[in-house]
Amino acid sequence: MLEKFHKNKKDSYLNKEEGSLTSDGSDSPKEILETSERIVKKALQLTEETDENVHPEKMQLQKSNGVAFSLSRDSLETNDSFVASGPNQSNTGLGLDTLEEQEEKEIFFAKLEQEASSPIDYSRLNKELNLSDSIVLAPFVRNESEKEVESTAEEKCESYSEDFEEDTDANPAFKTEESQEPNSGMLAKVVLLDSQDSTTEFQKAAETSGVALSEHDLPQEVGGTEMNEAGTLCGQTTSDTEALHHAYHHHIDQSLGDTDEQKIHSSSMAISQCLVQVTSQNHNLYSKNTSTTESDLPTVEEFMRPIKGDCYNARGFDLEPESPVKVIGSTVNEHVNHLPYKEHKNESVWETNLLEKFNREDSIFLQTAANEDSFLRMPGKEIQTSEVQPDVLSKEIIQDCLLSQGSKTKQVLQSCCLKNEKSESTTTKQMLYKNIRSTTPLHKKKSSYGPHGVVRSSGYGKSTSYSKQSIPATERKIPKETLKKSIMKCRSPADKARSKEALFTTRTIRSAANQQASKEDISRAMPDQSVVQNLGHQVVDSFRQHHSDLPVSPVKSCERELRLLRRAQVAEEDLSRARDVIQQLTSTVSEKEKEMETKIVELKTRYEKELSQLGQENYVLQSKLRSVEELSKEKRWIHQTGTVSVPEEKLAQIQKEMEDQEVIIQGYQQENERLYKQMKDLQIQNKKNEEQMYKENQCLMSELIALREKVERINIQSQIVRESEPARNQSFTELISELRAARKEETKLREEIRRLKQDKQALELDLGQAKKERDLAKVQITSTSSEKSYEFKIMEETYKQEILHLKRRLHWYAENQDLLDKDAARLKEAREEIEKLKQEVKKLRAEAGDHQCVQQKKRLRDRAADAKRIQDLERQIKEMEGILKRRYPNSLPALIYAAAAAEKTNDLSAKTNTTDFLERRIKKLETELEGKDDEAKTSLRAMEQQFQKIKMQYEQRLAELEQLLAYKWKSESPKLNGDKANCIELELQLQNLKKTHQITVENLQTEIENLKSQNSQLKLRSKKDNKDLQLADWQMKQGNTKEKLLKLNQELITKNREIQDLTKTVEKLQKERMAMLSDNNLRNKTDNKENRQESLKNNTVATEKRNSCNSEPLIGIFNNDKIYQPHNFSDSNVLEVLQENARLKEEVEKLSLEMNQQRVKSQATLAYSENNIRRIQEDTAEYVAALKASHQREVEKILSQYTKDDSASKVAELNGRISTQEILIKHLQEQISEHQRHQEALLVSQMREEF
């Protein structure tokens, strides 16, 4: 039977794919529905028979068990909650509590039911537990109507079987609630816990998560790469699983031979497609949480992962793997056995949706590709039984498919891509899945059914782990240590941490009465089987049990698999490209953020530096002011002590009086300020008190009015009601007491008002006294200021005279300095001329040496020749003279000739020598005169300087003598004039001291202002220099960039011209091609006319042939193919033209690419140049800042030196400057004298050379 099942499965799958590829819509929707319903009925009958044969014990247990409790956490949705069902509900599930806790719960619930007068609301009980317990579980509140619906559902599903290793929770109430709520993001707040750890970790994780999960929205597809670390691996090693998969695959290959399923092709494809859509909803959410090892090979976790059978919308099971696994698919039996029992009548809607699905071939291909491997490898032992009617089940399958049909195509595409990415690991999985069917026995799980399994555990006992489940006899031989080692090897460190921090996703509590049924259910949770494969296998197997008609070749399936693998590779490449783009974008964004951060930091540092500099400048100026004030005081006392020797006792008395006056003035000032503040405060207080009194008066008036009204009312009531006399007396006494209290308050307030008025009058008197004192102080200040102003004027006139005298001296020194500068410039020019002359002399000597060698050689040759000629001529002359002497010994002409010749030669030589000598002498004398004039000027200046020195010395000596005389006269005058003269002199000295002090203060203020102006000028100069530097740099950079841009523009212009030329050539070639084609058409028309005249009988046939002949050459020409035709001339140039056209197009494309590349390069160069400009600007800014800092330091040093050196008065400062300038003048005069000596030596040497 299993072989037939697998054959039907294979054939239906292949027929479904062929139909999706080649179907032309021949089958109608009604036929599809009829065939699908027949298939589902037969599949359900078969599954019922097999399940009754295989699981009779479980059927009995489920029928006999009328009361069951479950608390299930199968969902990984964020909006799930724990569901607590009462004792009359059919929620069963596998629990993790110990037997002792279950017994305690039974006792507790028995007590509750005995004590309770009405039926217990377990949802409210869960809420109360949520408030007190450390585990936060949101209850799933149910109404009485829902409980009734669940009880009706319980009657239907008493013998309801499980799909894998979990009991069903067939609650129809879930369907309505789950259809209302959309699936939210799963695994967002999932908390997992290793079952081998204590429940304290469960509590901690629950407290951290803060989200209670329920079975409201369940994951639809589970097939991850992690194994259930807390459960057992059924005692299988990798070798065992490989052997099982090999055997299973071999069995499937044998069973693929004779199949006959042509009739159910379209219906099976439709239903499987719907189921694939249903089971691929949450694929994207679960695929994020897959955990795989680093190697490409499949691990034990991948082979031994537990199967999680979740159905769509809370038709799940109680057991679920603890690790977050990737959602891929669910089984057919989940959709068949766990659908809610609900009659669906809208079959026409399903038919229309089915027709729309057949038209979407692309989505069908992708959906079938996602589960292709699972359709080909399906274990036959996953078939479950149910007693549900086949018609109802088929309708519910269709309804589920329609519900999940809406917007799931994108999720299916993503699931396909993610599955095909792991094509390497699926090859090994195929070998493993072959062996499952042949060797693995069925195992059942323990289930604890009890009437009170709803309530959560207290958390003190250890939870039951999967290692306590029963293991088959063939697998019990393997020790537990090897299993633990294999588990620890498979687990990565991150997975270990996750498993310890996490919760179990399933937590169901059952009594220990029906443990044997759970043992039988364990065998359905095969850890080697992924849910992807179970879905496909069970869908196709259920369709192929009774319809095996059409055999399919395995070659087509291989080709389809290759196609799908290619598509998967393309999708992987697209994903990798998208990831690369995303990484590039993130890197660029991060770089820009870093640049912005660095700029912000630089700006902050600049502003902080500027602030610190300004603070330093302020501090320096304040310190200068203080130092100047201190110096002025010191100078005043020094001048006082130096000029006039006054007795120290009188000076001390005068100082004390001055200090006392200043203290008195400061005290008056402080008292005035204090009294003014007090006056303001008192005015404010008076205003506040007046406002308060006014308000209180108004309140009292309103109270009085109210009291009067009350009194009137009481009087009226007393007149009307005379019987209630004691009550009236009481009210009257109360009113009297209130009036007395009000009167007391009024008296108190009046006393306060009187007191405040008295205070006000006292303050006004104080103010009057303060004003009088202020007026007296003003009068005193004006009198003292008028006396001092006269003294200030006298001191100003004296100092103005001194300033004029000093300015004249400075002008004279400036003229001296100009003369010295001129002399220095002349010396520099003379030195430069001397150096030039020396260089020329060296050159001339070198040239003369060369010429002398050549000339000497020539002279030697000429001398030899001349010597011979001279000798000949002398000999001839002697002979001639002898002849003449012999003939005319005393002739006059001979004597005259000889005398004239001798005079001429002597006169010429004498004239030339004398003129040269005289000219040289004149030049020397002129230079000597100029030098002497300069010396006379310098000597005059020196004499003037000496005269000024002597004058200054005499003036100083006269001043000293005058001071001595004054001192002597003053010392003698007290004896003569007495005390009055001393007092007058002291007063005069005080006035003089005051005048000098004021003058010094004004001078210091003027100096400070000058220094400030100088500082501002220096700052402006530095700023201007910086701006000039920046402008120069910027202009240079702009010039470079402009040159580059011009070059690039020229290149662009040349390229554009080349492109235009190429386009022109292309247009010419196209025109030539069109002309050629038009000629061909004309020739064809002439040929057609001749053929028509010749063959009139076969007119229709000929026209058709001619039309075909006319169209075919044109098509060939446009397709770059030349077809031979006998009636057309053989045009050999057309192909060449087309080839040239293609070549030119390629060149144009290349040129465009080159242009783009050059543009990119130009942009890169521009960016690089901009970066360089920025860097240079930053460097210059730093350099300028450093220069500014150094300049400020130097200025500060100069100012400090100035303040240190200038401890004396302004006259001493100017004297110091004059002395320094005199020293400089002496030094320069010495240098000038040395230079004059050098010049004279040079002149002597030149004269010697000339002579």
Swiss-Prot record:
Coiled-coil boundaries: 559-782, 813-1165, 1210-1242
GO biological process, one term: cilium assembly
Region (Disordered): 1-33, 144-183, 442-473, 1078-1100
Membrane spanning stretches: none
Location in the cell: Cytoplasm, Cytoskeleton, Microtubule organizing center, Centrosome, Centriole; Nucleus
Function as written in the Swiss-Prot or TrEMBL entry: Required to promote assembly of the transition zone in primary cilia. Acts by specifically recognizing and binding the axonemal microtubule. Plays a role in cell proliferation and differentiation in the neuroretina. Has an ATPase activity in vitro.
Family as reported in the entry's similarity comment: Belongs to the CEP162 family.
Additional notes on this entry: Depletion of QN1 leads to retinal dysplasia.
Name the UniProt record assigns to this protein: Centrosomal protein of 162 kDa
Source organism phylogeny: Eukaryota, Metazoa, Chordata, Craniata, Vertebrata
The encoding gene: CEP162
